């Protein structure tokens, strides 16, 4: 383990919207350092969303991220030989990174032809409380609800 907490590096806003969350999404989506490819996919996705829903792509994106954000999650805690799943609240930074990760995983698992289509459809679904990423959040919340009895083991 490291001695000190790692400093949080500040990300710059993306070139078109100046939005830091879009930059984080691009960084998470990028393979092999190909940021320009990831950016092209994101912006094409926003255009595709605008074609399909007649809403601004960035607004649907933010709405989807908000809907997929987990409020609570379970963490394993060993107490006297037994391992309990203890529900804990999720910090805002972790909420954001989990929602980004879940949306990308869900989009990659979809079976549309291009990543633009997959991501656009997953974002639209998430914004409308559907899709794999939203289901993942619901499952995490159900686990926390089911293990509410162990909430007093928080640390």
UniProtKB/Swiss-Prot annotation:
GO BP terms, alphabetized: translation
Pfam entry (one): Ribosomal_S7
Transmembrane segments: none
InterPro entries membership: Ribosomal_uS7, Ribosomal_uS7_bac/org-type, Ribosomal_uS7_CS, Ribosomal_uS7_dom, Ribosomal_uS7_dom_sf
One CC-aspect GO term: small ribosomal subunit
GO molecular function per UniProt: rRNA binding; structural constituent of ribosome; tRNA binding
Swiss-Prot/TrEMBL keywords: Ribonucleoprotein, Ribosomal protein, RNA-binding, rRNA-binding, tRNA-binding
Matching PROSITE patterns: RIBOSOMAL_S7
NCBIfam families per UniProt: rpsG_bact (TIGR01029)
PANTHER family: RIBOSOMAL PROTEIN S7 (PTHR11205)
Family, similarity comment: Belongs to the universal ribosomal protein uS7 family.
Quaternary structure note: Part of the 30S ribosomal subunit. Contacts proteins S9 and S11.
Protein purpose: One of the primary rRNA binding proteins, it binds directly to 16S rRNA where it nucleates assembly of the head domain of the 30S subunit. Is located at the subunit interface close to the decoding center, probably blocks exit of the E-site tRNA.
HAMAP family, sorted: Ribosomal_uS7_B
Protein name: Small ribosomal subunit protein uS7
Species of provenance: Wolinella succinogenes (strain ATCC 29543 / DSM 1740 / CCUG 13145 / JCM 31913 / LMG 7466 / NCTC 11488 / FDC 602W) (Vibrio succinogenes)
Encoding gene (name): rpsG
């Amino acid at each position: 383990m490291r001695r000190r907490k790692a400093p949080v590096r500040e990300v710059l806003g993306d070139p078109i919207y100046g939005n830091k969350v879009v930059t984080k999404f691009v960084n998470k989506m990028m393979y092999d350092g190909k940021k320009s490819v990831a950016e092209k996919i994101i912006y094409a996705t926003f255009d595709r969303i605008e074609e399909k829903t007649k809403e601004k792509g960035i607004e649907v994106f933010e709405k989807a991220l908000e809907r997929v954000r987990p409020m609570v999650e379970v963490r394993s805690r060993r107490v006297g030989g037994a391992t309990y799943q203890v529900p804990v609240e999720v910090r805002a930074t972790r909420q954001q990174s989990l929602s980004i990760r879940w949306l990308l995983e869900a989009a990659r698992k979809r079976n549309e032809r291009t990543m633009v289509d997959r991501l656009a459809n997953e974002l639209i679904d998430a914004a409308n409380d559907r899709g794999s990423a939203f289901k993942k959040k619901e499952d995490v919340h159900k686990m926390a609800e089911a293990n509410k009895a162990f909430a007093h083991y928080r640390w």
